[in-house]
Amino acid sequence: MNNSWNQVIYKVWSPIYDRFFNSGLFLQARKQVFNDLSFKQGQKLLFVGVGTGADLELIDRESLDITAIDLSGDMLKKASSKSSNASIQFFQMDAQKLLFKDESYDVIIASLILSVVPEPKECLKEMERVLKNNGKIIIFDKFAPKEKQLPFFKRIVRPVVRIFGTDIGLYFENIFHKYSDTLTVDEDVPIMLDGMYRKIIIRK
């Protein structure tokens, strides 16, 4: 996967994305991620890879200072159309090269983005950089099982799935290890499909 290809494939995905990833099991999973989260009035939130804005619909947007970025202009248009009455700033931006100052945000939401970007370690590095001290990164994504080899079938289909803009063979532990001195995992729980999808909360 690379950014150029991701822009192409998510242009294709944008008209139908919500049918697959903001309904049914995925909608239930997203709600489960946000159900027990609370935000303080005026907090600065950054949605990295906001997509069509599915997560924006699950929070009280009026009391928060929200910025949302995505590499795909087509996905951003979908997100902004859902949030016309809220003061959210939308930017087309590479999640691996965030154009924000250090320690700018209280909370970062990263749903289905680490498994999409070409360099997930760079993405996490950038999120850590722009996160304030004592801030949190909330991750909802699919990862390979901890300390287990990827099942044979997934190893076979992984290259094909990557063509559609995502990676089913990513180990979160491999991404996180480099930043374990500055970040702490507060929560890591299975959310969907026997733990393939997880909710992970990281604190700086």
Placement of each model-derived feature along the sequence:
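Class I SAM-dependent methyltransferase SAM/SAH-binding core
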Residues: K44-K97
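Short glycine-centered segments of the SAM/dcSAM-binding site in methyltransferase folds
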Residues: K44, N134-K136
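Conserved class I S-adenosyl-L-methionine
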Residues: M1-K40, A54-L58, K78, K82, ...
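A short acidic, Gly/Pro-enriched loop at the edge of an enzyme's catalytic core
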Residues: Q96-V107
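C-terminal lobe and adjacent flexible extensions of AdoMet/dcAdoMet transferase-like proteins
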Residues: K199-K204
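C-terminal alpha-helical "lid/dimerization" subdomain adjacent to the S-adenosyl-L-methionine
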Residues: S4, F20-S23, I138-M196
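A short glycine-rich, Lys/Arg-flanked "PGG" loop and its adjoining helix->strand segment in the class I
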Residues: K121-N133
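A short SAM/SAH-binding and catalytic strip from SAM-dependent methyltransferases
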Residues: V107-E119
